[in-house]
């Protein structure tokens, strides 16, 4: 039985014939005017974000495939973008490259199974600045011909390898940027550790992109030290809220707690934090009345709000969660039985964060089945936050996912980022005074979170 790749290549011959029939190329093709390679090197870790409507492994991924709306989001987060041009298996087109090039400022990769010089010329005419060449598809002679054609048009080339044999071939040829595909193109299975296996076989100074199977910030942080960037498509395209998906993937699921002002909540959202925390414990200096909290949640609807409760009645928690449309409740001092009871009363859209207060490793506790994650905070006199940190090294073997809280600030953020937390929970470290956030510190923190 032919593999998926073999079927694609068989159909690609027919597709290229149709492209040649439908598109007349100009005699002189303008060279690329956007530097794809340079854009990849502007940050320690770069992101090629992809426009992908469908794929052979997943079928239709994004029904509402609005190129302009996708572009608006990718402009904020992408180093470069990738546009699928394959029509049969990915529902892409070369016309999509033209549309994206007219509305995006980012260098564009033409993503296709390129077997013919016509595809590269057409991609350039449509506005592409780089092409993908796959050693699983091309022999050495054809690869070099296509590589040299692309370079003559001032285009970058992303050469894809997927195994040791292809790397051995590549090292005898020319290359520009190297992509390690984590997907087996014959079975369509993915394994992100494929990048870790193949990276040592490539030159240390090579520009390396990890492709396929990237779904989480944890995967990004695990692979980032050994590559220059990532090509990501399916994991973003499947999400309705594309901006939030980009933030979670690139920055993680971070939170600023103790919000008491609308303008602080707006600053938190603007700087790409996922969560804003509202403290409903009256003994806290950051306590906020539910009616005041409602004003904030209504004013900044796209920020996911988390309510912090300390030994409050279940009925009261459920009422506030519904009224404010909380995305999670953060619980201090509740038994497993109480958490189970609360789960029944909460809206389905509201998760439970089980707080575990920590002084030493003996305090680490398993998550109850009703909770979506554990939040580790410092054990102290006050439940609901003490503004001091604990020895984070004891979390080295903690089960994920978990959030980390307790005395986080700009001075210890680098150490905190080494902990494998789903996200970090900031509060007093970003304040002018209790409940009053410092927008400059929020901005500075956002920059640090992206510096990897």
UniProtKB/Swiss-Prot annotation:
It catalyses: N-(5-phospho-beta-D-ribosyl)anthranilate = 1-(2-carboxyphenylamino)-1-deoxy-D-ribulose 5-phosphate; 1-(2-carboxyphenylamino)-1-deoxy-D-ribulose 5-phosphate + H(+) = (1S,2R)-1-C-(indol-3-yl)glycerol 3-phosphate + CO2 + H2O. Its EC number is 4.1.1.48, 5.3.1.24. This is Tryptophan biosynthesis protein TrpCF. One of its GO terms (biological process) is L-tryptophan biosynthetic process. Bifunctional enzyme that catalyzes two sequential steps of tryptophan biosynthetic pathway. The first reaction is catalyzed by the isomerase, coded by the TrpF domain; the second reaction is catalyzed by the synthase, coded by the TrpC domain. In the N-terminal section; belongs to the TrpC family. The gene is trpC. PROSITE patterns: IGPS. PANTHER family: INDOLE-3-GLYCEROL-PHOSPHATE SYNTHASE (PTHR22854:SF2), TRYPTOPHAN BIOSYNTHESIS PROTEIN (PTHR22854). Keywords: Amino-acid biosynthesis, Aromatic amino acid biosynthesis, Decarboxylase, Isomerase, Lyase, Multifunctional enzyme, Tryptophan biosynthesis. Residues 1-253 are annotated as: Indole-3-glycerol phosphate synthase. Residues 254-448 are annotated as: N-(5'-phosphoribosyl)anthranilate isomerase. It comes from Helicobacter pylori (strain J99 / ATCC 700824) (Campylobacter pylori J99). InterPro entries: Aldolase_TIM (IPR013785), Indole-3-glycerol_P_synth (IPR045186), Indole-3-glycerol_P_synth_dom (IPR013798), Indole-3-GlycerolPSynthase_CS (IPR001468), PRAI_dom (IPR001240), RibuloseP-bd_barrel (IPR011060). One of its GO terms (molecular function) is indole-3-glycerol-phosphate synthase activity. The keyword Lyase applies. Disulfide bonds: none annotated.
